[in-house]
Swiss-Prot record:
Pfam families assigned to the protein according to its UniProt record, in alphabetical order: Ribosomal_L28
Name the UniProt record assigns to this protein: Large ribosomal subunit protein bL28
Any single GO BP term: translation
Keywords associated with the record: Ribonucleoprotein, Ribosomal protein
Superkingdom of this protein's organism: Bacteria
Amino acid sequence: MSRRCELSGKAVMSGNNVSHANRKTRRRFLPNLCQVTLISDALGRQFSLRVSAHALRSVEHNGGLDPFLLKASDAQLSSRALKLKRAIEKVQAVAA
């Protein structure tokens, strides 16, 4: 399982620890990932996703999983999230 957010694409970054003597050693910056269960109103189901805390705040800010996915670009979504987005678009197209 990769350390990558399924909704925002946020992943591991690398950098340096810098000591007081200005010595540099390599380190990794890990994203703050949480295993959460989000509910899709359009599909009427729950989905378990591994998302960053930042993406979780964005989902809440946008009014839920469905509006967030519809607004998000396809490039930053994981394959599972992209399938969810397509399913939500299909349900909304039938309802309209």
